[in-house]
Design a protein with these regions (language model features):
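Hydrophobic transmembrane alpha-helices and immediately adjacent juxtamembrane helices
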Residues: 1-219
Length: 219
């Protein structure tokens, strides 16, 4: 364990530079830049809430906040694991030239996705603010208590889970490149098995609930 920690500390500046590089590359040609990390989930939550509340008639108080909370966590996991999966193969030329611990690359992708999610959390704060003011949704149904500060706990759980899964996928992808295509299909099914766009009472008492309980993202 000490050896891994020493190696991590040795390459922490490389990790920082790789994360900074990915941030610059992602928003390099964008006028709004990093602001899209806030606007994208905010706009998506508004569109999804309009569609599902008007066409599917889901009776969920403040559906936009319900959706945004779940989608931020799930999208972080999806982005982190998907990018970590191809990170070693994508950096093969660099790995062949100099010695760098291979786990640095999946770790960097997961941390980049985590940083991106932290910026996206601003969208959730904005949505809660406009709901509390009564601009959208129902302020009476929005009860904000001190327990909101515990939100970082599921975030950290998801971070550790994403890192572990990302490392496994990155190793498998080196030998079996088709795993990327299979994983994209799996994550789509995974999303629908996670109560993000529908309330739990829709599936309670059905066979689907038994499958959903096996889903780590459900908890």
């Amino acid at each position: 364990m000490k050896a891994y920690l020493a190696t991590f500390l040795k390459y922490k500046y490389l990790l920082h530079n790789l994360i900074s590089r990915d941030l610059k590359v992602k928003y390099r040609r964008s006028t709004l830049g990093l602001l899209w990390s806030v606007l994208n989930p905010l706009l998506m939550s508004i569109v999804i809430s309009i569609v599902f509340q008007n066409f599917f008639r889901f009776d969920v108080p403040n559906f936009a906040i319900y959706y945004l909370t779940g989608s931020l966590i799930f999208n972080f996991m999806n982005e982190a694991t998907s990018s970590a999966m191809v990170s070693i193969v994508g950096n093969a030329p660099l790995i062949k030239k100099v010695y760098i611990p291979k786990y640095i690359f999946p770790l960097e992708k997961v941390m980049f996705a985590f940083v991106n999610m932290l910026f996206s959390m601003i969208a959730l704060v904005i949505m809660m603010g406009v709901t509390k003011l009564g601009i959208i949704g129902s302020a009476a149904d929005l009860n904000i208590s001190w327990t909101i500060v515990l939100f970082f706990i599921p975030m950290l759980y998801t971070l550790v889970f994403s890192l572990g899964l990302g490392l496994i996928l990155a190793a498998v992808n080196v030998y079996f490149r088709d795993v990327g295509h299979l994983y994209s299909v799996w994550t789509m099914a995974w999303m629908y098995l996670t109560p993000i766009i529908y309330p739990m009472n829709v599936v309670e008492g059905t066979w689907a609930m038994n499958i959903i309980r096996l889903n780590p993202m459900y908890y």
